[in-house]
Each structure stands twice: as structure tokens, then as C-alpha cells.
Amino acid sequence: MPDDRYPVPADRHRVTQEIERSRFITTVAPAATLEEARAFIDEVRAEFPDANHNCWAYVVGPPGSTAAIGMSDDGEPHGTAGRPMLTALLHSGVGDIAAVVTRYFGGIKLGKGGLVRAYTGSVQQALETLPTRERVETATLEIVLEYAASKRGQPADQRVRLQLKQYRL
């Protein structure tokens, strides 16, 4: 799929699953900029302030792009939450996306492998039912012709200014 046309989340989407008495709440949202991704993560954290963990990952840009990515294990053992979540997003075929998995610990330790499977599975479950829309990048060319007032006998000053604007629809 070309970089100028790709699926993005249509809106926020949430799924919940229970694994070994721990509750995993996955929230996915569109994030066309780093600021949008960070604001979304902060909003979910504020919504679940009593959670044991709010792990997150995002991909800003086309599907699979690594130009603007981020992740956090938020207190889980290193590499057991953020990285698996990011990998799921990178392989999803969806761009401009952020995900937060909120975990309420249920009393049973999952181990590193269990955590990787739980966080990967949580994001994949959300992606399976995620409504998407197509993002199309377009270029608009604006041409402005300016004519200066001329005095008798002097040629009019003519300038052409070209301006290329990028829009994401």
C-alpha cells in the first residue's frame, strides 16, 4: 500500500479481557502527531489512575513506519509490554495509531512469557475489531499572482509565488 493512502483508526476503540484474574483494558485511538499520541496516553492514564500499569505504544505515520514510534512498559519487567505492543502495531497494517493497555493485577504472576503473550494478545484483540477509515495525503498547489501598481512608463512588477501545502484528510 502506498504511503499516501493507508488505514487509520476511525475513532477510539476499547476491548477488555481477563487473563489469570488480571484485567487488561486495551484502548486504541488515532494519533496523527506525537502530540496527539502523548495526549491520548495521558488521558487514558487519568481515566485509570488506580491501575497497576498503563503500558503504551504508538506509531505516527504510515503502517510499519519507524520514523515516529514510542513505547513504555510502565513498571512491568523490561521488554514484556511496550515492545510487544509496538510490534503488534507495526505489523497491523494500520498507521497513525496509539494503544494503551491498562492492567489491574489479579494476584497471579504471569511470568515474562505470559506478560508478552497477554500484552500482544490484548492489542491484537483490539485491532481485530478496530473500525478504520482511509487516510489520503493530498497536495494542494496555490498560485498567487501579485501585480504592483505601476507609474506611467514603468512596467508593472509581476511576481509569482508558488506554495505547496500538504493536507491529511
Enumerate the predicted regions with their spans:
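Hydrophobic side chains in well-ordered alpha-helices
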Residues: 37-40, 119, 152-156
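Short amphipathic alpha-helix segments
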Residues: 144-165
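Short glycine-/aliphatic-rich beta-strand segments at the starts of folded cytosolic domains
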Residues: 133-149
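Short cationic amphipathic helices and targeting signals
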Residues: 27-29, 140-145, 169
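Generic alpha-helical secondary structure
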Residues: 34-37, 78, 82, 116, ...
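C-terminal regulatory domains involved in ligand/effector binding and gene-expression control
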Residues: 1-80
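Active-site beta-strand/loop microenvironment that shapes enzyme catalytic pockets
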Residues: 81-129
